């Protein structure tokens, strides 16, 4: 759990923390990225996926299903076809009279914030389909305010002119615009703007593709794959931005924030929903406090110039129903980012502006919320996230910070299905509220921080699925929810991390074992839990670097049953299935040394804790409890008062030992 506070700077404490910093184990190389070769001297966890043949078949119902968001339900009243050729074009209008549509060249203008390109304007109320093809240099600005519209990209390549504006812009509010990519087509949109380019910036809209209304990226149907759309941001703000919500369906969407001065790949004010398709996001932006994220939802939009704040009550969320998502970013991979601590909603100095989002009439119509609800819900898909940035934070929420987490929700985070692989420098999964895992297959590995971290009063609940969570060493752990409950009711669970851990709740419905490092073996060895007949009921092969503590649970472990722990066993995989070396179906196991025997749980206490857990000294050995130096209880400084007369850690250490001096 990360809490920012005003620290008392004390030179002696800085020295103590620095001397102890070597105990922290890093999972990354000096570039901040995960190493691709085997090199475990620094405790790096290497996992290239070769230890996985398990296929998760969990399914969950899709959320936020809106019939009008399906392109097959869009019926156009007219069509505007534009064929580009360099700086010129030809057009054809059908279904409506040609005079109803204005297509004209425009120049850079600071007075009305237009940039050099073509302006396509329709003032009527009919639903139009715009078909774009060919090559063009300049901004394509579509003014279609009164009805939904579709923009079909038919092998088109658009590049904004001289860094003066976005490449594709839509003015429509309170409507949806479909960006349709037919199967067999390849389309590229390139925004040439760079940061601090004000002398040539005539249109400073926030996205390379920018819309005031909802944007829906899709193939021609919701059941068949579409074509390919590449969006390249050279280094100015975001690649895709909507002041409403963004939805992604069947297409291949590749978004790259190419320049280090760029920001997020896809950002929306109200929501992001991913239903299907192949989504690849690369964010290289390294601006302090604005490093690139992959998918981000703000929840509110405060304008300090006219002192207004725009938001939609109950929005601010991210829902992933399916698709193949591959994200590599400096900062967060996926984040529902709205913070109540930073909001100006309700501030008398600001005028609240109702956001007439289509979500209000289609999805949020029964909400009783007064403010945004920044939750994340995952109902399926294949999600891979790698973050590369070095975490840092200031004294307060308003100070610069970078938390390169994999998936973040400022409210609750729920995983119902999906295969998720997260390799991050900060927490792999983080929620300001509760975390509930009902299904899916999740691999979460953090090189510097916790693997899965909840800050909600109900903590972390695992009801099913497969979870392999690997935190850093020392003060970091696999599962962190401080004094809130960590409850395991079902699923296959393996956690590795530091011994300053959150203890599983004894009231969980599934037998759980907590083992100290001397009981589960060393790196690259295999652990087996066997029953009284010597049959393996739990098998895990440790990665190339070990940790101080292991938490494990499985439906195969029963209460009132005696088990033994064997280390250094020989495993013959055969046809057994495994997920990042956690076996779901049991392999053949032989040999090894018995480290523990006669261990069991009861119906009233589902957790067995090894006597080797909870021994040690400064800064965190043992289950989470109020701080101190002592052996057997955790010296965890996060979110708790420090011992009397002891100064707080210096700013930047996040209440724990630093990984290294900066």
Regions found by a protein language model. Name each.
Residues 9, 27-662:
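A composition-driven surface/loop motif
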Residues 22-26:
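C-terminal motif of bacterial Sec signal peptides marking the signal peptidase cleavage site
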């Amino acid at each position: 759990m990360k809490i920012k506070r005003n620290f008392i700077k004390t030179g002696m404490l800085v020295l103590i923390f620095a001397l102890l910093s070597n105990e922290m184990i890093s999972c990354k190389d000096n570039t901040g990225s995960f190493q691709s070769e085997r090199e475990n001297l620094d405790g790096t966890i290497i996992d290239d996926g070769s230890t996985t043949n398990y296929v998760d078949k969990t399914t969950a119902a899709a959320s936020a299903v809106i019939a009008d968001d399906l392109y097959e339900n869009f019926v156009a009243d007219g069509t505007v076809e534009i064929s580009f050729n360099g700086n010129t074009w030809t057009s054809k209008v059908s279904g409506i009279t040609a005079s109803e549509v204005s297509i004209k060249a425009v120049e850079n203008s600071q007075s009305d914030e237009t940039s050099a390109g073509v302006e396509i304007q329709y003032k009527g109320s009919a639903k139009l389909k715009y078909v774009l093809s060919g090559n063009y240099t300049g901004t394509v600005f579509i003014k279609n305010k009164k009805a939904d519209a579709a923009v079909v990209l038919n092998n088109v390549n658009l590049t904004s002119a001289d860094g003066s504006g976005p490449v594709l812009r839509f003015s429509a509010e309170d409507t949806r615009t479909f960006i349709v990519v037919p199967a067999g087509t390849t389309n590229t949109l390139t925004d040439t703007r760079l940061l601090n380019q004000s002398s040539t910036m005539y249109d400073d809209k926030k996205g390379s593709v920018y819309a005031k209304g909802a944007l829906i990226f899709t193939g021609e149907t919701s059941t068949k794959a579409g074509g390919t759309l590449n969006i390249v941001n050279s280094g100015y703000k975001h690649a895709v931005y909507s002041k409403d919500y963004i939805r992604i369906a069947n297409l291949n969407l590749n978004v790259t924030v190419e320049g280090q001065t760029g920001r997020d790949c896809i950002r929306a004010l109200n929501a992001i929903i991913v239903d299907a398709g192949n989504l690849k996001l690369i964010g290289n932006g390294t601006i302090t406090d604005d490093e690139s994220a992959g998918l981000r939802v703000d929840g509110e939009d405060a304008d300090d110039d006219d002192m207004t704040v725009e938001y939609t009550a109950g929005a601010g969320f991210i829902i992933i129903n399916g698709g193949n998502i591959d994200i590599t970013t400096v900062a967060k991979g996926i984040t529902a980012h709205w913070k109540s601590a930073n909001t100006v909603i309700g501030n008398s100095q600001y005028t609240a502006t109702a956001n007439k989002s289509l979500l209000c009439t289609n999805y949020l119509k029964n909400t009783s919320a007064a403010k945004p609800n920044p939750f994340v819900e995952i109902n399926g898909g294949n999600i891979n996230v790698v973050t590369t940035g070095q975490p840092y934070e200031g004294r307060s929420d308003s100070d610069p910070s970078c938390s390169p987490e994999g998936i973040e929700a400022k409210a609750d985070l729920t995983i119902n299905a999906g295969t998720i692989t997260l390799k991050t420098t900060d927490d792999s999964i983080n929620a300001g509220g509760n975390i509930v895992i009902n299904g899916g297959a999740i691999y979460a590995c953090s090189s510097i921080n916790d693997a899965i971290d909840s800050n909600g009063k109900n903590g972390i609940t695992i009801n099913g699925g497969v979870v392999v969570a690997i935190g850093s060493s020392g003060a970091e752990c696999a599962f962190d929810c401080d004094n809130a409950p960590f409850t395991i009711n079902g699923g296959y669970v393996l956690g590795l991390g530091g011994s300053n851990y959150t203890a599983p709740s004894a009231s969980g419905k599934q037998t759980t074992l907590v083992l100290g490092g001397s009981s589960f073996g060393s790196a690259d060895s295999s652990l087996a839990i066997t029953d009284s007949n010597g049959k393996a009921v739990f098998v895990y092969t440790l990665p190339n670097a070990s940790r101080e503590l292991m938490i494990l649970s499985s439906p195969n472990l029963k209460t009132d049953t005696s088990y033994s722990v064997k280390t250094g066993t020989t495993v013959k995989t055969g046809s057994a299935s495994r997920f990042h070396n956690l076996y779901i179906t049991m392999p053949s196991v032989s040999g090894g040394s018995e480290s523990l025997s006669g261990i069991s749980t009861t119906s009233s206490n589902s957790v067995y804790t090894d006597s080797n857990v909870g021994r040690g000294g400064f800064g965190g050995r043992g289950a989470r409890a109020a701080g101190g130096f002592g052996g057997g209880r955790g010296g965890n400084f996060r979110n708790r008062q420090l011992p009397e007369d002891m100064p707080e850690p210096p700013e930047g250490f996040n209440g724990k030992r630093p990984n290294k001096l900066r």
